[in-house]
Amino acid sequence: MIRKLKNKHSNQGLTMIEVIAVLVIVGILAVVAAVKMSNTSDYDLASQLEVVKGHLRLAQAKALSSGSSWGINFTTSTTYYMFQETAPTTPVLILGEDNATVDLVTKKSALTITSAPQTITFDAYGSPGTTTLTVATNGGNITVTKNTGFIP
């Protein structure tokens, strides 16, 4: 008869080394996450840059749908507004904004338009013209492609 040897030691727990290793790994991950979350200025610049791109695309869409020119006028490094061809000095309220003139300081954004003053106008076909336009900011450049009006 062959008897099975029973293991008298139970494997139902964790060793102290395993517990310490898990705690060290969790601690390292917590520190990395805290460092990433503490500096949100890069995320602010990137998100506000996308908002400005969205406003440019809105002006382009309005030009396409209305059959008349629309544009964005970057008046200072922190303010801009959308306008229609018939009244280029009269700001038009941008969808989702509280005021017709967008003020980046009021929005508590660190984004600044370094190429201001600058005006970008889209014709009835959504084209900015025959020249590629660049809106320079401290968060990166916004390129409006000639003829097509593509904004990457």
Task: Describe the predicted segments one by one.
Residues W70-A124, N141:
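Type IV pilin-like appendage domain
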Residues S38, D123, T145:
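Residue-level detector of conserved, well-ordered beta-strand and adjacent loop positions
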Residues M16-V19, K146:
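Structural motif detector for alpha-helix initiation sites
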Residues S127-P152:
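Low-complexity, S/T/G/P-rich flexible repeat/linker segments used as non-globular hinges
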Residues I17, L23-A61, S65:
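Aliphatic-rich helix starts adjacent to a transmembrane/signal segment
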Residues M1-L14:
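N-terminal leader/signal peptides at the extreme start of proteins
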Residues G54-Y81, G149:
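Alpha-helix exit/C-cap motif
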